C-alpha cells in the first residue's frame, strides 16, 4: 500500500509529493520547497515517519517544481531524475527564475538519470510506471500506480483544466493528444494528483474538463 503525502510549496503554490510504502522507502516527486520553513516541514515529516528517501523524481523541470532539488541533494545526497527532453530544451532553473522576475537563486543540480516512458521505478515492494505526457514541456512525464489507482501528473492535467503551453517547447495540440492517450485511457476511478490545485479523477476530467 502506497501512502501519498502532499505539500504545497513556494510562490506558485506547487504540489510536492512524498510517496512511501510499508517498507518505509520513499520517493519525492517535484520538490518545490524554497523557504526554510518549507524545508523543515519536509525533513521533519521524513524523520518522524522514519522514511528512507530513494529517489528524487521530476515530472518536468520548470522552476516551481525544482526549487528544492539543491536542498535535497545537500541533505540526502540525491540528484534529480527526469526526462532528457526537458534537460536539453529548457533553460536552467536559475535562468527561469529570473525570467519570472524572481530574485532568489535556484541551484541547478545536474540530472543523474534520464527517465523514459514505460520505465518502472521501484518503491519498496511497490512500483511506479512512467508515462510520457509532453506538451506542457517537451519532457513532461507522469508516474502511475495501477494497484493503488493513482497518477502523479505534474502540470499536464488539472481539475477542470490543462497545463499552459506558452513556455519553452510547449504545444497545446501535443498536450491534449498526450492527455487523451496516456491519462484519460487509465481506469475511470484513477485519482489524478496534479502539480497545482486539488486532486481529481479520470472520469471527472473525461466529462467535465472544457479543454478536452
Question: Model-flagged regions — what are they?
Answer:
Residues 7-8, 104, 110-112, 132-134:
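Short Gly/Pro-enriched turn/cap motifs at secondary-structure boundaries
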Amino acid at each position: 500500500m502506497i501512502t501519498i503525502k502532499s505539500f504545497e510549496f513556494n510562490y506558485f503554490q506547487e504540489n510536492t509529493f512524498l510517496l512511501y510504502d510499508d517498507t518505509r522507502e520513499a520517493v519525492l516527486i517535484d520538490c518545490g520547497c524554497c523557504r526554510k520553513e518549507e524545508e523543515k516541514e519536509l525533513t521533519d515529516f521524513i524523520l518522524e515517519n522514519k522514511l528512507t528517501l530513494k529517489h528524487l523524481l521530476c515530472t518536468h523541470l520548470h522552476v516551481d517544481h525544482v526549487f528544492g532539488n539543491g536542498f535535497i541533494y545537500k541533505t540526502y545526497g540525491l540528484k534529480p531524475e527526469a526526462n532528457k527532453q526537458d534537460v536539453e530544451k529548457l533553460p536552467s532553473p536559475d535562468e527561469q527564475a529570473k525570467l519570472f522576475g524572481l530574485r532568489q537563486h535556484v541551484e541547478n543540480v545536474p540530472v543523474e538519470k534520464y527517465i523514459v516512458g514505460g520505465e518502472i521505478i521501484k518503491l519498496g515492494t511497490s512500483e511506479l510506471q512512467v508515462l510520457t505526457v509532453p506538451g506542457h514541456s517537451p519532457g513532461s512525464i507522469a508516474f502511475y500506480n495501477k494497484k493503488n489507482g493513482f497518477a502523479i501528473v505534474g502540470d499536464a492535467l488539472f481539475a477542470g483544466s490543462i497545463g499552459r503551453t506558452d513556455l519553452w517547447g510547449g504545444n497545446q495540440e501535443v498536450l491534449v493528444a498526450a492527455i487523451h492517450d496516456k491519462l484519460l485511457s487509465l481506469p475511470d476511478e484513477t485519482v489524478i494528483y496534479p502539480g497545482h490545485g486539488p486532486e481529481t479523477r479520470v472520469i471527472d476530467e473525461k466529462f467535465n474538463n472544457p479543454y478536452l
